[in-house]
Amino acid sequence: MKIKVKLPDGKEKEYDRGITPAEIAKELGIKKAIGAVVNGELWDLKRPIENDCELRLVTLEDPEAPEFYRHTMAHILAQAVMRLYGKENVKLGIGPTIENGFYYDFDIKNGRLTEEDLPKIEQEMKKIIKENLPIERKEISKEEARELFRDQPYKLELIEEIEGNRVTIYRQGEFVDLCRGPHLPSTGIVKHFKLLSVSGAYWRGSEKNPMLTRVYGTAFAKKEDLDNYLKFLEEAQRRDHRKLGPQLELFMLNTEYAPGMPFFLPKGVVVLNELMKFSRELHRERGYQEIFTPLIMNEQLWKISGHWDHYAENMYFIEKDEERYAVKPMNCPGHILVYKSRTVSYRDLPLRFFEFGRVHRYERSGVLHGLMRVRSFTQDDAHIFCTPDQIEEEILGVLDLINTIYSQFGFTYRVELSTMPEDHMGDEAIWEKATTALKNALERAGLSYKVNEGEGAFYGPKIDFHIRDSIGREWQCATIQLDFMMPEKFNVTYIGPDNKEHRAVMIHRAIYGSLERFFGILIEHFAGAFPTWLAPIQVAVIPISEKHNDGAEKVARRISQEGFRVFFDNRRETLGYRIRQAQTQKIPYMIIIGDKELESGKISVRTRTGKEIKDVDPEHFVETLRNEVLSRKLELSMEG
């Protein structure tokens, strides 16, 4: 029987049913093929093709290639661990690819792997790569799979969850794994890898299950790419907010008494207050009204909103006086209550409510991560209530606000629009009108965007913003979400020109997203060296010796009177030590006062990067600092 295969150049060829991509690659003279994409699905090079299809061969240069070779590298890792620690002592979890790498989970009898074990595992992996073992894909019955994995309890659990009676396994030498693929044709194709770290991970992510050992690694087709990625990781580690935050006395974490709930220290509160001040200024200019809603509200509110049915496991509850309350996980129901506290006319719209709202959401302890994944956080939440005809202009206003805020920190960003899913609520005509309004606003703002068809929330289309930091990482932050569900549930209406009630449109939006998470991103983006307007201490005044204290204190007082944050460092430490401390604390400016400065009335300024400017008029410095802070410059003015 023949099948038709359509190739990337548009040509259609006939082949015998069961032909493999490897055979097609040979016919086409493509010697470097490592796999294929068949009807959009990643496909092993030696896997038979049974039906008509579109086919594109994959080489190591193609964007799909990492999925093949990193998946295979995860199997090589598992094979190496089983060789080193004994098949009878190693129970296998799962070993998927992840962004920029892979991992495998192990349950090892009488012990756990540590990072000291990684070098010897790497050596064993190199042996397996050198052996260049053929990798074979095979479909077997569940009964055969149960027998094959009879000593692997985690695999047996997975087998039972697979639909149908057939499962896929992969074999390389003596190693066999339950896997859907895809994989390389053999173990020797990609040689450039590195094991990165070891951590604990609960089986299936549940704390009720055993704790396994997770080994992370990465792999690249070229050594140069691997080396560059390892340098990137080193730089990311240097910027890690979990390390810099405590070092710079910005925040602390206490996992014993408040896991996932950061404590902000005085210097960290300065930064948070500056972030909120900046945001408030922009919101006031754009007609937002700031409100403040309760932290705890009756359970009935959350039943109406739907959180009770769909989000209860992530909420915290309190029972008092035979009434049950919930600590709010979101701000929207509270904002709706404010809206509904009076009759709203179409002439009042749009109404823009804004709040720095503290919310609490339960997260498993295993996924908590510094300020990036917490249980208690503050959202810069706003809800816009408007008519359907006002959607486009309101979205355009939000887009401008987002651009203004992100530009202030030097972030570039990309935009994604997610549209109506199959299981949507509400009238399709309303969806169409709303989606068109979002597209029009994006285009009027001059923003290019990617459309994720069918990936919107069931209650409305949304726009997501992914900011790019100074070392190229992306963070999803701002969201603009149209909501057709909450106005229905809470009967959110306005009185129209016809003196009748009409359903209002509700737009959710956050820009920082989580204030705590955005703070963490900024720490890493700036490597702790905040622009002067954000810096907890803006100027350190350092007398050279005790006899210079009085003169230096006058300088410190003068600068402080102008509203700047000044640290007068007259500690009985060496001058070099105090300068190094100021640099370690990443204070933008240091003023050094000695005999020469006291005699001349001038000051010597040193920036945190080490640049020295002598004979500076104090008033000129104050004016320069004022302009730098008021304009919220990213760079230090005196380094220009």
UniProtKB/Swiss-Prot annotation:
Where does the record place the TGS domain?
A: 1-59
Q: Where is this region: Catalytic?
A: 240-531
Q: What is its EC number?
A: 6.1.1.3
For molecular function, the Gene Ontology terms on record are: ATP binding; metal ion binding; threonine-tRNA ligase activity; tRNA binding
Q: How is the cofactor bound?
A: Binds 1 zinc ion per subunit.
Mention any Pfam family matching this sequence.
HGTP_anticodon
Record's catalysed reaction(s): tRNA(Thr) + L-threonine + ATP = L-threonyl-tRNA(Thr) + AMP + diphosphate + H(+)
Sorted alphabetically, the Gene Ontology cellular component annotations on this record are: cytoplasm
Alphabetically sorted, this entry's keywords are: Aminoacyl-tRNA synthetase, ATP-binding, Cytoplasm, Ligase, Metal-binding, Nucleotide-binding, Protein biosynthesis, RNA-binding, tRNA-binding, Zinc
Instruction: Give me the residues that bind Zn(2+), please.
Output: C332, H383, H508
InterPro entries reported in the protein's UniProt record: aa-tRNA-synt_IIb (IPR002314), aa-tRNA-synth_II (IPR006195), aa-tRNA-synth_II/BPL/LPL (IPR045864), Anticodon-bd (IPR004154), Anticodon-bd_dom_sf (IPR036621), Beta-grasp_dom_sf (IPR012675), TGS (IPR004095), TGS-like (IPR012676)
Known cofactor(s): Zn(2+)
List the subcellular locations: Cytoplasm
Is Lipid metabolism a UniProt keyword of this protein?
no
Name its GO BP terms in alphabetical order: threonyl-tRNA aminoacylation
Q: Which domain of life is it from?
A: Bacteria
User: Which family does the record claim for this protein?
Assistant: Belongs to the class-II aminoacyl-tRNA synthetase family.
User: What is the role of the protein in this entry?
Assistant: Catalyzes the attachment of threonine to tRNA(Thr) in a two-step reaction: L-threonine is first activated by ATP to form Thr-AMP and then transferred to the acceptor end of tRNA(Thr). Also edits incorrectly charged L-seryl-tRNA(Thr).
Oligomeric and partner information: Homodimer.
Which named protein is this? Threonine--tRNA ligase
> What's the source species for this entry?
Thermotoga maritima (strain ATCC 43589 / DSM 3109 / JCM 10099 / NBRC 100826 / MSB8)
